[in-house]
Amino acid sequence: LLALKDIEHLTNLEAEAISPSLAAQFPNSGPENVLGIELNTYAAELARVSVWIGEIQWMRRNGFEAAKNPILKPLGNIEKRDAVLVTDEQGNPVLDAEGKPQRAKWPKADVVVGNPPFLGDKKMISELGEDYTIALRRAWSDVPGGADLVCYWFAGAWRRMAIGELERAGMVSTNSIRAGANREVLKSIVDGGQIFEAWGDE
């Protein structure tokens, strides 16, 4: 959000420098431009509050008056749900009419920035349950069975870019993303696109 607001603010200032008639306007971008999916209830609410705090800090730092009444507003565009598999409220996979598990849909966006959960493939059944893990692998049959959980986010982002639904994506992962079955997910991205600004051991 802060980067988006910085870009908009800089554009307004440059427009004003070109012509006084293009005087800098009040920022239009705000928390409503930030969409998100978070499974944990506490983390979802924390994300909503963090976005609002960032908004208030940016407005004050750049000489604008922040909202006062109320200071924080509901932010329903950060959803509390599974990001890779359609599940019910108990976290059980929901099957379609043909009895198949379904990939979760992501909100329409231009850019995705994600910090997916890190869980090795050998721990998925013990941590997520056998039914969930089997359903996840069935729904994402293009992801190798031995891939870590984080790979489903990489595959999801790339699939959307490949069909023009997404412009860019930035993901956080561990170094294990470069090895084993995980590497196959990266290979499909490199074969059809490009990975840049990849920072190792950060």
Name each model-derived stretch.
Residues 8, 41-44, 52, 56-62, ...:
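Signature of N6-adenine DNA methyltransferases within the class I
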Residues 1-7:
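A phosphate-binding catalytic loop at a beta-strand-loop-alpha-helix junction
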Residues 47:
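Conserved SAM-binding loop
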Residues 34-37:
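Conserved SAM-binding motif I beta-strand of class I
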